[in-house]
Design a protein with these regions (language model features):
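Acidic, metal/ion-coordinating pockets
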Residues: 2-21, 26-32, 36-37, 42-418
Length: 418
């Protein structure tokens, strides 16, 4: 199996995912014998007919259950965000008996591991030591904001002091995998830091480490957890990523993914950067003359198209979280890890780890936030002051009002009030 599968135009499913046609039962031939044998054959025929009916009923049921990632199945279980229930309340529509399974998802913010030969002396894995117990779930993901490898051409000109090109050794991918990560988003403004060769080396390093990735143009990544098929799509406002600025195309890609998978998770690398970029507002955001997308409009559009969870990165600060049609949108989890590559003054050092459980039909089954703070050169550690919770609550309330997520002091994500 390849690490990633590209979207194909049109709604047709691959051959192995199509519902097989049921062959008609063969007709039984009979000959006229004695009346006694005819009577026995008549009774036998009745028994066989009853058996065939039972087999057909079981067979049809089996086909339905085995091919549960068909478009019809999604409409029935409400994977489309618009079917979440009155008021868009999470959990307002009880999960059907066949959708009682859940997937636990852990998400972190932006991570890179150094540049220009300056890397953690204890290895990349040492960056995660302080939060090692928080990175294990059915699916642990994050935003990989660096190229991996040793070749390629840097995007920065000679002697540049305002340009940052991140590239870490290919072995860094193995350290990320060993820390507990299953997949990473590569749709961001640093995936091209070593040019086209760097992109190829990054993909090769991730593949060798058995670490899945998403975010290249046209790329949708599929994986299975606990029998639940999950689609991952990443978007950013750059030509070498899946395009965040074309909302209709993004929505169409999500609809195709929702027709093939039970859960759809969308990563967005969107918005301005830095301490002044904590607030999320409607409209296009810009930074350094670049259009960085409209995070709210984009997130709402992909949920309307069938996304069950939207995970944001890019601003390098914590941002608000929102309930929209019963689906959770986290606009930014801030920084997660770096090595002398991230400005860590004030709010840029405050971060969080998001833990979510989703049912197979996409509805919210529970979640929590672990507040962390980056210390030293950029290592995450638990934050005793729990600043991240207070920040997310404040931003969610001020920026999003009633749809803003509320997090209890314990870190538990509360259901939206009806």
């Amino acid at each position: 199996m390849t690490s990633d599968r590209q979207d194909r135009p049109g709604p047709d499913l691959p051959r192995h995912e199509r519902r097989p046609r049921r062959s008609p039962s063969p007709r039984r031939r009979s000959r006229h014998h004695s009346s006694r044998r005819a009577d026995l054959r008549g009774r036998l025929g009745a028994w066989l007919a009853a058996g065939v009916v039972a087999v057909l009923v079981i067979g049809v049921t089996g086909l339905y259950l085995l091919h549960h990632d068909s478009p019809v199945r999604h409409l029935a279980t409400g994977t489309s965000g618009a079917a979440a229930g009155p008021g868009g309340q999470p959990g307002s529509t009880p999960a059907p008996a066949s959708d009682t399974g859940t997937v636990s998802i852990t998400d972190v913010g932006d991570m890179n591991f150094g540049m220009n030969g300056h890397y953690p002396p204890g290895g990349v894995g040492s960056l995660f030591a302080g939060v090692a117990g928080d990175l294990h779930s059915s699916l642990t993901v994050g935003n990989l904001e660096t190229a991996l490898g040793s070749s390629g051409t840097t995007k920065c000109g000679a002697g540049s002091t305002e340009c940052f090109a991140f590239q870490a050794p290919a072995a860094s991918a193995r350290a990320v995998r060993q820390a507990g990560f299953s997949a990473v988003n590569v749709a961001n403004n640093h995936t091209d830091d070593a040019g086209a060769v760097g992109i190829q080396e990054t993909d090769a390093a991730l593949s060798a480490a058995h670490l899945r990735w998403t975010g290249r143009p046209g790329q949708t990544t599929y994986l299975v957890r606990h029998g639940i098929k999950i689609a991952l799509l990443g978007f950013a406002p750059y030509s070498y990523d899946r395009n965040l600025l074309d909302i209709p195309a993004a929505a169409a890609a999500v609809r195709r993914a929702a027709a093939r998978a039970q859960l759809v998770i969308v990563f967005i690398h969107a918005g301005a950067e830095g301490a002044a970029a904590q607030h999320v507002r409607p409209g296009m955001e810009t930074y350094l003359g670049e259009k960085r997308g409209d995070p709210i409009a984009f997130s709402h559009a992909v949920v309307d198209a069938g996304a069950d969870l939207v995970l944001g990165s890019g601003p390098h600060v914590l941002r608000a979280m929102q309930w929209y049609h019963g689906r959770l949108i986290a606009y930014s989890l801030g920084n997660f890890a770096g090595y002398d590559t991230l400005g860590l003054d004030g709010v840029t050092a405050d971060s969080a780890i998001l833990h979510i459980r989703l049912r197979a039909n996409g509805t919210f089954a529970g979640g929590s936030v672990t507040p962390i703070r980056l210390v030293g050169a950029g290592s995450p550690e638990p934050d005793p002051a729990r600043t991240g919770i207070a920040l997310i609550n404040s931003l969610s309330r001020s920026d999003l009002g009633a749809s803003g997520v509320r997090i209890a002091a314990s870190g538990k994500i509360e259901l939206a009030r009806r």
